[in-house]
Amino acid sequence: MAKASVELTRELQDSIRRCLSQGAVLQQHRVKLETKPKKFEDRVLALTSWRLHLFPLKVPAKVESSFNVLEIRAFNTLSQNQILVETERGVVSMRLPSAESVDQVTRHVSSALSKVCPGPGCLIRRGNADTPEGPRDTSPNSETSTSTTHSVCGGFSETYAALCDYNGLHCREEVQWDVDTIYHAEDNREFNLLDFSHLESRDLALMVAALAYNQWFTKLYCKDLRLGSEVLEQVLHTLSKSGSLEELVLDNAGLKTDFVQKLAGVFGENGSCVLHALTLSHNPIEDKGFLSLSQQLLCFPAGLTKLCLAKTAVSPRGLQALGQTFGANPAFASSLRYLDLSKNPGLLATDEANALYSFLAQPNALVHLDLSGTDCAVDLLLGALLHGCCSHLTYLNLARNSCSHRKGREAPPAFKQFFSSAYTLSHVNLSATRLPLEALRALLQGLSLNSHLSDLHLDLSSCELRSAGAQALQEQLGAVTCIGSLDLSDNGFDSDLLTLVPALGKNKSLKHLFLGKNFNVKAKTLEEILHKLVQLIQEEDCSLQSLSVADSRLKLRTSILINALGSNTCLAKVDLSGNGMEDIGAKMLSKALQINSSLRTILWDRNNTSALGFLDIARALESNHTLRFMSFPVSDISQAYRSAPERTEDVWQKIQWCLVRNNHSQTCPQEQAFRLQQGLVTSSAEQMLQRLCGRVQEEVRALRLCPLEPVQDELLYARDLIKDAKNSRALFPSLCELGHVLANDGPVRQRLESVASEVSKAVDKELQVILESMVSLTQELCPVAMRVAEGHNKMLSNVAERVTVPRNFIRGALLEQAGQDIQNKLDEVKLSVVTYLTNSIVDEILQELYHSHKSLARHLTQLRTLSDPPGGAGPGQDPSSRGRGRSHDHEETDDELGTNIDTMAIKKQKRCRKIRPVSAFISGSPQDMESQLGSLGIPPGWFSGLGSSQPTASGSWEGLSELPTHGYKLRHQTQGRPRPPRTTPPGPGRPSVPVPGPRQENGMATRLDEGLEDFFSRRVMDESSSYPRTLRTMRPGPSEPPLPALQKRRRRGLFHFRRPRSFKGDRGPGSPTAGLLLPPPPPPPPTQESPPSPDPPSLGNNSSPCWSPEEESSLLPGFGGARGSSFCRKMGTERLEAGDGAPAPGTAQPPRVHGVALPGLGRTKGWSFDGKREGTDPDQEDSTQAWQKRRSSDDAGPGAWKPPPPPQSSKPSFSAMRRAEATWHIAEESAPNHSCQSPSPASQDGEEEKDGALFPERMVPARNAKEPPIGPRPPKPVAVPRGRRAPQVPGGREEAESSSAAPGANKPWLRLGSQQDQEEPEGQVPSDLGRRTAPLKPKRTRRAQSCDKLEPDRRRPPDPAGVCAGTSEPGTD
């Protein structure tokens, strides 16, 4: 600050400073102010940054007048110490005390003006030419400097402050700080009014006005912000003054027609205007503004490079003027690169569009063309583009237009010609454009002929392609190699996706696929489509990198696709938004993320996900280190936050923390990838290898004594193959370990270490050179300061010690960051190599083992033929049976392993192992999933085999049929419908078709709408479950009376499988009647509407129960389900002769057959065979018994019986369930049918059954061994089926009849399976031959007592009312 005049007192100076507290007082001078001509008065001149103040010589000081430097029109120095200032309000003349004071005032005003209006040269000249000018300081920090090259953002802050002072407004320091700090740090030359939208309109106007004098900013941007009239006036002022503003963006700023007219006038006034990009979209400028702007654009010598006039309410008349301007000004043909006229309906619908078409047909430089929503005729436009835009056009948006304004089915030739001739297209948008089939074919044919394009994004969404379009895509898309991204959303493909999805997979150039809003199909078809999609992304050569099924409303079936993401290695981005998959979908997604290592981006929202679903995702991301981005699910998060705000906030913060962690380079868990790949590679073919090795070993042992040399050579080769097969088990881990050992000190790491050392040396050398150069330059600029230093060398060494780069940092950056990324990629490649080698070797071993097995089996057959006597059949052997046996042996060789070891089947099974099975909460039954997954190569029983805890027979060869070698047979879709009962038994030549019974995966209740969509296409329940079951050997006698007409109609009814409400009771383990089934109640009257009680077949057979063909097909593999007709023929006589004794040793128990609860008919409580609701005790509601109740209530369907599970020693917790579900056995031969009433509580309660129902034998659970024995009770009559002979004991009928008259006929009937027990009489026949009684309760066996000891809580006093007269001991577990 200059020194104040000597005449000014200290008190006056302080008073002036206090008066101008808002601005710092830079100078104070005592002057003579000319108030009248030749009359001067004393005043004080105070100078601030942007204003000159005049004060009288009074205390306290008060401003008499002031003016801003921007008000100065002329500043003249009339004499050595007199100045004349001409302002907007008048002329001010004053004398200063000395020439030095005049010079100080002049330099201050000149510096202020140069900051506001930067420019070269001196702004103030002295009026007297004889007086030489003093020396001017042009240093950057001097007050008289006019250089603005070193000012921040072109001095915007100073200009803005001066304008605020000029207009008398407060200067916003936040504006100055933002510009000087943020804009300067980003080197941003775009002034965005949205950054200051929170300020008032007058403040925005001053910022825009400051741009008129600023040379730093080149772009003014404002979008979606309505600007006031003050701001718009300053925009026009800025455009009229600025010589540096190149781009103006006023998108949706509330502009009117008059503004555009004024803007056109401004362009004409400013000859130095350099504007080349103009955006006025979403403003109603209408035709008047369009015409004015078009006329002014004719005068642009350089034209425009970008013009955006989208949604401006322009008519074809305005477009015609604009097109004529483009054609009249030749500069536009070479300068215009970006043209957007979209969202103007009807703009190109008339003949006025020919002016624009003419411009487009000429050679031009257009790169981006957007004409969406303009009613453009696509065929005419493509004809114009074919001549003028093929060489440069990269973006073409023709959405929401019509293909042609003419009616006709012929494809326009422009489609094929343009798309085959374009050189640089990268984005084509034809969405919501109704393309005829011929146009679509022409488009695809043109792209298939184009060899210049690659990675083209083609948007065909909402084009209503439907079936015809899907067919065209299937035919033409395979030959198109330039499409990298294809959007087929919302095209109504629906069921056509079954064939379209595999066709899309054949295009290996396709990287991004969008299929949303195309799944409006039934549940069964939807699942098939999703499985096709799963098959597509699971292909080894799949090229897809991103997949979108957004807004498809897949709901819970989204999990079918999610389950395939776990082991998927091709997809990096997936969009699952808008599918309503709920929390169960989030849980399935979390399981996939735990093992996936390829996904980088997941988009999911609008899925009804709660905080629990997000919690599952957060837990999954803890073990996922590769997912980088997850879109913020606004809809689901807001909904979850309303219900659980704290949990939702914590979970989302955890998700974000995991994503931030994953975005940093780090080590990927290779051990997890190794274990996952090992399970998928080795376990797929390991079982086949083991079985083949076992069979070949048996054949080698059988042929080891054969003296023939060729046979011995094959045996030696077979032994070598077996050895290789055993070694192949360790092939995968050994190769992985070898790669890991070699990688520790491999050439890559050695090279990285050497590079780190070289980089460290290079960094040191570079720093040395830089420091020496900097010190030398500093010495030249500031030699005195450098001389003060102790010496050049010492300063250099001190600086070098401070700016050195540590070697550990360089080594860590190369080895731990970049090197780790390289190592992760190297590990992925090594794992793929190991997988390929292992698969190749295992496939070769399987083929060779199979060929060896076939050859050795052929030798065995020849030896058996030679060893047979030439006389034919031996004694007691039927020649036909022996021939059948030989043919069966030969069939075993081919049928058990299939016609060949199909490696494709193994690959399909491996692919299926990569897909997680569908959750039981989602799927109705595993059988439905198996039938729908046939095209994927999933063997029958695969899902049930994965979810079953039952062990399979490892020594059985029936499991080899799990690898299918040919397609599935066609099956009638309606054969599962309920049918009326057949009166004629099927002939021996008509085989029974096995029908798998419906089961559920985890016993949970199905949804209410489950099964409604595919009701008429799948079997709801077994036919035999609707009626009382009979043994296979039982046939109703001819004397059986026919059923009533009402009952026949009910049985033939479609909904005969429905149960009455009384079946919904729950039979818990502690129920009073859980272990005792009462005798049948009396027959009902004709008006009773209860269906016949479904009774289970006998379980007392010691060899195998007499299953019906439907029941045999429903068994699990290894438990009789795959034995076939030969096993039934072999076991037929044994079943009839074995009786009801205990099971023979080594005989497998039948497994539990799980049933599926029908919609609305699932049992929430227990039900009994006699149809009576059974209650439960309050003390049964513990966790274990509740789980058993769910299993027992959901595993059995209506009318389904429950065979016992595996032996008690393996699953002791199920003993109570088995005893509760045991049934009675009928032991005696039935006499003529007599309806008997039983004095049971069931009959007293009014429970009734229909006459003529057939009741097989029933079983009663064993009581506790510690209870006192119950004395013999008189036998009670039971209903027995007619036409059935009782099983014969070894003693014959005479022995049985003789024992019937002996005393002690009420002796319990034992079922121990021994010869002694078999010789005992089975029951006492009473004197009344018209009645037959059931046997008494048997003695307790050790195994039954051991079963009781496992559950002591079942012990309770017996119920004498529920004990029948005679019982039969069921087969022990």
Swiss-Prot record:
Q: Which InterPro entries match?
A: CARMIL_C, CARMIL_PH, Leu-rich_rpt, LRR_dom_sf, PH-like_dom_sf, PP1-Reg/Actin-Interact_Protein
User: Does the keyword Cytoplasm feature in the UniProt annotation?
Assistant: yes
Query: Composition bias, kind Polar residues: at what positions?
Result: 1232-1243
Keyword hit for Repeat: yes
LRR repeats (start-end)? 242-269, 272-299, 333-358, 390-417, 422-446, 453-475, 480-507, 510-536, 541-564, 568-591
Q: Where is this chain compositionally biased, Basic and acidic residues type?
A: 1007-1022, 1218-1228, 1345-1358
Return the Pro residues bias intervals: 981-997, 1078-1097, 1269-1278
Q: Where are stretches of biased composition, namely Low complexity?
A: 138-151, 1098-1108
What's any GO biological process attached to this entry? regulation of postsynapse assembly
Q: Which spans does this entry mark as compositional bias, Basic residues?
A: 1047-1062
State the UniProt keywords alphabetically: Cell membrane, Cytoplasm, Leucine-rich repeat, Membrane, Repeat
Q: Where in the cell is it found?
A: Cytoplasm; Cell membrane
Residue numbers spanned by region Disordered: 126-151, 864-902, 970-1373
Q: What is its main location?
A: cytoplasm
Can you supply one Gene Ontology CC term for this chain's record?
Answer: postsynapse
On tissue specificity, the annotation reads: Widely expressed, with much higher levels in fetal tissues than in adult ones. Highly expressed in newborn brain.
- Show the domain comment: The C-terminus is necessary for localization to the cell membrane.
By sequence similarity, the record places it as follows:
Belongs to the CARMIL family.
Q: What is this protein called?
A: Capping protein, Arp2/3 and myosin-I linker protein 3
